[in-house]
């Protein structure tokens, strides 16, 4: 494998600002060809805690300005006032960044009662349904365990941990922590634990989202067509999403359940911020609407514009993607060999391609720079049993 020495400060001066601040990025980086270039021309070579939060190097001009605007909207703490964002009346997070810290995953500090710090389980999402998947009356798909002042949350989450010790075949022991969740303080009828299916999820990283949205659908469908390996117990299929009269390939979120980056849904479902796609409050018809009115909330206008949401969409599409690290390390190379020996690559595909025209944002802006790229996501975009 050929190694190229790249002097970063000559090409990416804005990146060095983070390097100097944290001291964890390198000025000289070994840049291998091939699979280490995770996202084609959008690959960067940063290793600090901010590595997920930089724009791709091909971004410039008005697109770079909009990226910065979207970054601000992504991280800004929203409040309940119409001027500052329309948070609530109930919500699960107070900004995109409260769940996706620096465009990555937040590590929650879980308390046994009340969740994570003063904001409850603000870095996790709690999905509640009946055992058959149906929603409960008076509740939606997400438990909103937070609310603005004077409004009652939908419920509170508590957790109890059970630590268990196991053993690898070679005798080395390891410990796993099993959480058991309990929901209390239901605002309406209490739901019995035996009737409840509760899924507590850590939000996903937002790195590589633009490349994912630009993937060639035909390539994913071809993977599904050949993804049948009975000798390994593996099969996969595409997940198609029908919404507003259009059927599209699901790519994003848990189990490929969305065909876009769900910016509008995130504003609505997670923060209670109404928009053109979801104009109703998430607690529509619940007592929290009246409680919010008593606290001075007005529901006669949308809380965020489509233009602002598209700036957030652009920010997520145009993030740079860190390269694979330590690709020449013998231990890493041994792990890669085991990856193939275990047939992980049959599902977590190592190489994919983006379509010619790139990606289109939620309000019609096109990003052709995401097109015609060879990427190495090591990701699985199919559904499996």
Where are these regions (language model features)?
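Sec-dependent bacterial lipoprotein signal peptides
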Residues: 1-17
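Extracytoplasmic redox metalloprotein regions
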Residues: 45-47, 52-66, 76-309
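Secretory-pathway/luminal and periplasmic proteins that interact with or process carbohydrate-rich
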Residues: 80-82, 98-110, 321-323, 342-346, ...
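The canonical Cys-X-X-Cys-His
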Residues: 70, 91-103, 206, 312, ...
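Bacterial Sec-dependent N-terminal signal peptides
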Residues: 15-45
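His/Cys-centered metal/cofactor-coordination and adjacent catalytic loops
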Residues: 313-325
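Surface-exposed intrinsically disordered loops and tails
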Residues: 43-44, 184-185, 356-385
